[in-house]
Amino acid sequence: MDSQQDRLAKQVLIQKSFESKRLFLTILRFAIPTFFFALFSAAYVFVDQIMVIKFVPHGPLNPDSIFTDQALIEEFKASAFYKGGDIPNHTELTASQLVKTVLNISQPIVVILNAITIFVPLGTGVIFSKTIGKGDEKKIKDAWNTGLVSTTLFALVTQIIVLAIAKEWLQFNLDKVDEQHHVQVADQFQHFFNEKAVAIGSEYVYILIGFNIIPMLSRLFFYLGQSEGRQLFIAIVPPLSNLLNVLFVFLLVRFSTLGVVGSAVAAILVYFITFMAYVVYLISLNKRGLTYLSLRDFSFKRVSFNLFLVISMVGLASFFRNGSLSILNTFYESFLVNLTKTLTDQSDTFYLVLLTGPIAIANLTSAAIFGVLQGVRTVVSYKFGQGQLADIKRINVYTLLVCLVFAALLYLILAVGLGKEILVHLFDTSAATLMLANQFSLIVQAQVFFVAIGATSQQYFQNNNRVLYSWIVSLMQGVIVFVPLLFIFQAITLQTKNIEIFIWLLTANAALAGLINVLIGQVHIHFFMDKYFAQKHKSRIVQFIERYS
């Protein structure tokens, strides 16, 4: 059992972190570290994409690469797709474009992996913060034990499921058409190109999926550490790990024949290093008696199935959001490829390739905004545990302002200020398509403003036991608003025969969903929050959550 001195040390640390009279500074103290944590965690994939695009294909940066345009053609000639005839000059279907296509069709699976990664850990973090706010040591220990076991088991089960459907998902992302026996050489090469992209993409995502348990446990340790008021060490690890990631990707891509797969191997190595850093830190805290994450007192007897259900209900909103966005990306890319074939004489993946950079940056900035919200979520959960509803209202206003400021900074830097330079130097956008790609980038990255205002409602409902509302707002952008808009934009694009209209879908969807979400959240906060918490008889779901957390 913890000694009285150990308990006092932990309580002092928590009070210093959470109970400052300057609430806005408390928000920043938690939001800034989680912003950088989320930014650099998302940058793993972002940096991988850049390094792969720059170093995998044969070029000045990698003159020894075996991934050349000629090698691609020779492989096509030796494949079952080639039925004879002269091979046309494919200016778009090059080794470089193959790499970009692989990254694009893999992106939705990477997004769903992120959804899986944060599902149970985030729910555990919210419950853990609430129990610390209440000061109930029994429930604190129950949350720690249940969260650790649940994260491990959930990781193993989901890895098996996603591995089983990964290849078919990649094929759907590319809208792979049925192979025909008598087609023109141009179509033959397109079929070969698509099949090659799916094969490489499968190897890439299999590695990331197979080891996804490592980043899941790292996330768990980060969320729980922050719930105890710790910021410095847990926030420093991701940036340092990201630097290692750049080094490993360079070595494996530049000096091996692994190609795109090399970046996945590098990511797993870095995930493992990050995980071990947190484990060593946790052991150090245990030895000094400065953490509730006790390894010595861990017991399977404290694992509660009912608490796991509570954790799942809370974390499900974040899973729904990331998962639905993965489905959104899949359908958007599939419809875009179909519209490209129908309305233009470009290759199937022409516009898909142009959007590689803009979509990657948009995903990065959205992840960073959700990092800000994670820091806020920790504070709100603690305040909720203490019953400080007035502070929760003030935090909501501060959160909206902070998220908009961060969104504006990200957009001005990454879209406006450095937009063209990023597209040219990091994503190898050609001079011929730079103006169009930059136009798309400005449009697509504008989503970050609406993500910033809409996501505050999800955070509010998650932390205040209103899980049904949190599920609704989390599905707003990826399903509820997106599905009708998808068909509306498709119809308008076909009617006007202007495919650039379809590019606006992502931002229009984010704008409408964000405005609806913030309206729902603000109405509940100002008109229903006080009445709801004053009620003695609450819904069964809320009673269940309050009983076990």
From Swiss-Prot:
Keywords: Cell membrane, Membrane, Transmembrane, Transmembrane helix
Protein name as catalogued: Uncharacterized protein MG447 homolog
Major place of residence: membrane
Domain of life: Bacteria
Localisation: Cell membrane
Top-level taxonomy: Bacteria, Bacillati, Mycoplasmatota, Mycoplasmoidales, Mycoplasmoidaceae
Origin species: Mycoplasma pneumoniae (strain ATCC 29342 / M129 / Subtype 1)
Membrane topology: Multi-pass membrane protein
GO terms, molecular function: antiporter activity; xenobiotic transmembrane transporter activity
Keyword set includes Transmembrane: yes
A GO CC annotation given for this chain: plasma membrane
Spans through the membrane: 27-47, 108-128, 146-166, 197-217, 233-253, 265-285, 308-328, 352-372, 399-419, 434-454, 472-492, 501-521
Cross-referenced Pfam families: MatE
